[in-house]
């Protein structure tokens, strides 16, 4: 079933302020360490009594978050004033009429000023601002300095490629940490490789089911050569077919570790591991970082893009107050605070100049650059179909061939989008 075909409506009662106090805004959040609840309290305070914000935590995984929000919004639930939304779902929700667009040019300017280019691309649908980047994310290349030195490579060099990285790991008898399980993290990897090679997974994404799959291309072949080449090399991790972010991190910190592509949280996790005795200090001191590796030495990489956008529910009873709350939550100051306290990178460029951010993230400038230059996953109401098509035709990684796999993906995806194949 196409992901743009939404769950049937259910009857839900909206929430409001029935105690005579300021209007109550409900913010549906993804799970975090409490940072969003803190921002809700602080913005409530700074509103001077104009509104109150309560948070409602969604399930852990993105698919369950989407399902719960869709059920409420399909029922016209006015209690969904604000929602933390995974960027790939923005187009689907906006296309269904679930998100309240920001139309006043002054408001658009305020919400987008200083927002990095990568996340800003995910906030629009049909030329309207339908969400505001709250925090962003990207993957860096993490490497063990001792391994790079022994192999005689410099991962910070401008033209450093996946092929060079694989050769270096093989030469030193080490393994590379990637996300090879059949899940969204694998789609993130494949999309980043295709984008880095100058291609895209679909064209005319705004056409929805009429979009054209374009994986079968020189860029798709180049991406397949990286995935299949790594999988069939001695640098592949033994658990490649089931590896996610945490498996990659565990490998990287082990004696077999060499290189890894992963989100910035791994640095803080390693530091906390040292404090807790789970990671040796010499391992932490050996960790270095660089920009996401290139597919082609002559073409800059387009690193992965993640994060959360903040959207206003179209059925809210308090659209103006919800907009004011979004402005508060996504301010530069709160972006910086959330990055330090929750460990999630900021969507606004100015937050990276904050002294506390720079202390917590020595690679802050690289994170900012990477997010700005990142390649978003396809922006389409049928994103679930597109992602699942890639995951099913590219897994396991050891089966990926060029040519072959890209053509299979286009055929499979075309049938899914046309309703000729069920997922």
Language-model-detected regions and their locations in the chain:
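Extracytoplasmic/periplasmic solute-binding protein
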Residues: 130-134, 139, 163-219
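Glycine-centered hinge/linker elements that transmit conformational signals in sensory
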Residues: 167-170, 208-241, 288, 292
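Short, solvent-exposed loop/beta-turn-alpha elements that line the ligand-binding surface or hinge
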Residues: 103-115, 158, 180, 199-222, ...
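C-terminal lobe and pocket-closing loops
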Residues: 265-283, 295-393
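A structural signal for short loop-to-beta-strand junctions that line the ligand-binding cleft
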Residues: 70-72, 79-81, 109-146, 298-302, ...
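Hinge/lid segment of periplasmic solute-binding proteins
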Residues: 87-138, 284-290, 359
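Conserved C-terminal helix/tail region of periplasmic/extracytoplasmic solute-binding proteins
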Residues: 149, 369-423
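Conserved N-terminal structural module of periplasmic/extracytoplasmic solute-binding proteins
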Residues: 2, 8-91, 108, 415-423
């Amino acid at each position: 079933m196409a992901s743009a075909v939404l769950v049937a409506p259910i009857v839900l009662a909206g929430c409001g302020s029935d105690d005579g106090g300021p209007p109550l805004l409900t913010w549906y959040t993804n799970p975090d360490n409490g940072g969003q609840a803190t921002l809700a309290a602080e913005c409530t305070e700074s509103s001077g009594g104009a509104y109150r914000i309560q948070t409602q935590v969604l399930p852990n995984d993105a698919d369950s978050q989407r399902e719960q929000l869709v059920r409420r919004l399909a029922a016209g639930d006015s209690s969904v004033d604000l929602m933390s939304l995974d960027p790939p779902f923005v187009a689907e929700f906006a296309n269904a009429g679930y998100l309240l667009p920001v139309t006043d040019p002054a408001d658009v300017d305020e919400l987008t000023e200083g927002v990095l280019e990568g996340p800003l691309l995910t906030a629009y649908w049909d030329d309207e601002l339908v969400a505001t980047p709250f925090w962003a994310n990207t993957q860096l290349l993490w490497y063990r300095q001792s391994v790079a030195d022994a192999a005689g490579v410099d991962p910070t060099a401008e033209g450093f490629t996946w092929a060079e990285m694989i050769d270096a790991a093989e030469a030193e008898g080490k393994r590379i940490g990637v996300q090879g399980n059949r899940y969204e993290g694998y789609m993130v990897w494949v999309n980043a490789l295709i984008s880095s090679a100058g291609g895209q997974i679909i064209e005319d994404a705004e056409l929805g089911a009429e979009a054209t799959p374009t994986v079968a291309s020189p860029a798709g072949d180049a991406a397949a050569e990286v995935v299949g080449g790594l999988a069939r090399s001695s640098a592949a991790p033994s658990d490649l077919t089931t590896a996610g972010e945490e498996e990659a991190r565990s490998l990287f910190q082990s004696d077999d570790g060499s290189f890894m592509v992963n989100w910035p949280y791994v640095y803080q996790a390693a530091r906390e591991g040292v404090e807790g005795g789970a990671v040796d200090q010499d391992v932490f001191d050996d960790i270095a970082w660089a920009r996401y590796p290139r597919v082609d030495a002559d073409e800059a990489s387009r690193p992965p893009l993640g994060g959360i956008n903040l959207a206003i529910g179209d059925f809210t009873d308090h659209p103006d107050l919800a907009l004011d709350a979004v402005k508060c939550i996504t301010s530069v100051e709160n972006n910086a605070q959330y990055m330090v306290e929750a460990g999630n990178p900021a969507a606004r460029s100015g937050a990276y100049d904050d002294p506390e951010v720079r202390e917590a993230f020595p690679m802050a400038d690289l994170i900012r650059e990477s997010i700005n230059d990142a390649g978003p996953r396809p922006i389409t109401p049928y994103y679930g179909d597109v992602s699942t098509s890639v995951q099913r035709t590219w897994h396991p990684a050891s089966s990926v061939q060029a040519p072959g796999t890209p053509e299979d993906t286009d055929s499979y995806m075309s049938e899914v989008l046309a309703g000729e194949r069920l997922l």
